[in-house]
Amino acid sequence: MSGYPKSYNPFDDDVEEEDTRPAPWKDVRDLPDGPDAPIDRQQYLRQEVLRRAEATAASTSRSLSLMYESEKIGVASSEELVRQRGVLEHTEKMVDKMDQDLKMSQKHINSIKSVFGGFINYFKSKPVEPPPEQNGSIVSQPNSRLKEAINTSKDQENKYQASHPNLRRLQDAELDSVPKEPSSTVNTEVYPKNSTLRTYHQKIDSNLDELSVGLGHLKDIALGMQTEIEEQDDILDRLTTKVDKLDVNIKSTEKKVRQL
């Protein structure tokens, strides 16, 4: 047998527990129609304005954080393109040097074929060969557009780090500096004079200004990378032609050596 009386409703406890839950956010449809309705409506509108201003500030801060990260990635990619250009230019110079050495070898082979020619060439002064290139760090200059974009972004990097030490949590760092008022204690003053709302508006405007500048940097980086890639494509085309020509000359020289 149950220990409860017959008239006991087991769901009464649930009702009491539900009453202890925090009240949901007021909606305009939940506002009373009594004499306090105008005051409640004003308070609701102020809360709604603050809530939306806070959400907008957080959203623009997140967008700003993503923009900073994108710019850093763009600069890193541009620097890798510059390094790649240096490798291509160095490779092209090495191929040119190999072609010169191969031409000199072909002249020696042709002179060896004739004993008389060999004696004459023996007493002739040897041609002056260019000094070998010193192997060192490869220094290459990118196109002017990309170089300017990289320098501009790097100049701004210190400013970004000083303003936002942790870019991945930029939105938290930004909003923590904004004084917040509890939603239940909104001032009865007209909200344009509200310091919290004014701070949110200033933060939103500042974020939008920085977003505009940052997007301009991203555009310059993208255009500079496009020009750099096109120029490196030209280097690759030249290098491919020279390598093909060098391969043919090597096979021809090898054939002449076997005929000696």
Swiss-Prot record:
Compartments, record wording: Cytoplasm; Golgi apparatus membrane; Cytoplasmic vesicle, Autophagosome membrane; Cell projection, Cilium membrane
CDD domains per UniProt: SNARE_SNAP29C, SNARE_SNAP29N
Cellular component, GO, one term: centrosome
Ranges of biased composition (kind: Basic and acidic residues): 20-32
Lineage top rank: taxon: Eukaryota
Cited InterPro entries: T_SNARE_dom
Signal peptide from the UniProt entry: none
Residues with PTM Phosphoserine: 65, 77-78, 114, 163, 184, 206, 212
A GO BP entry: autophagosome membrane docking
Keywords associated with the record: Autophagy, Cell membrane, Cell projection, Cilium, Cilium biogenesis/degradation, Coiled coil, Cytoplasm, Cytoplasmic vesicle, Golgi apparatus, Membrane, Phosphoprotein, Protein transport, Transport
Known role: SNAREs, soluble N-ethylmaleimide-sensitive factor-attachment protein receptors, are essential proteins for fusion of cellular membranes. SNAREs localized on opposing membranes assemble to form a trans-SNARE complex, an extended, parallel four alpha-helical bundle that drives membrane fusion. SNAP29 is a SNARE involved in autophagy through the direct control of autophagosome membrane fusion with the lysososome membrane. Also plays a role in ciliogenesis by regulating membrane fusions.
Family stated for the protein in its record: Belongs to the SNAP-25 family.
Name by which UniProt lists this protein: Synaptosomal-associated protein 29
Annotated organism of origin: Mus musculus
